[in-house]
Amino acid sequence: YNRNQTAIAGDRSLVSVVAHELAHSWSGNLVTNATWRDSWLNEGVTSYLEARRMEIIYDRDRVDEERVLSYEELLGNFDTVPLDRQWLAPRLESGDADDVQGTIHYHKGQLFLQYLENGFGREVFDEFLFGYFEDFAFKTITTEIFLDYLEDGLLDPNPGIVSRAQVEAWMYQPGLPADAPVPSSSTLQSAADQASAWASGETELVDIPTDTWSPQASIHFINSLPANLTLEKLQLLDDAWGLSSTGNAEIARTWFIQVANRRIEIAYEPMRSYLNR
């Protein structure tokens, strides 16, 4: 679907959306998933390529922030999506795209490729990816075709790192394998600490250095606010940061989820406007 309107924040802060769509030139257009159950070959691979591109545009710290948010959204999906839909390649008897629930195929797919990169090293994994796109150019493939290619082109030539069984645990099991990577970000941890300090009254909003923050840090701050925070403090935050009127669609989405969950009625009208964009 087209996200161009929400990608225009006016400050180039949502370049990742553009990077994602550009990456579809390879995963999605050049090599296409054969069925909806193989959607991770489209969106998961694209999300991984997006992160690699963002590392070039910005730096590793920014990418770490985005990976943490992706991981947190994935865990949130696990709370609501049935176990048999948490597989990367779930059984879809109907073949209906609507049966691919949530955004698991984006985030779990990206994390799976990061797992492979971590295990085999970037140079070796990049060589595999180049070969993958070359060998399957202008073709549609299934998960099982990919797994056979992965085994022949990466697992077997580099024994003792990742087994076929470990890969299949990602494909055909709910949740995440025990050895899945857990992203971390020092800047997002700082934002979470600031959220806790402000909520407890240890610091004031004016003392929080938001001028040096990325949108991801603001999002993490909002998501880190305790559940028992008073409506008065939430309104104070909205007034100070202009959350209900922000032009950044991702920050707005995060804030309005809080508005809905916490019943912040004074922000209902801006939320309606946001939803009707």
Q: Could you tell me what each predicted segment is?
A:
Residues 102-108, 125, 136-142, 154-277:
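Long, ordered, helix-rich scaffold segments
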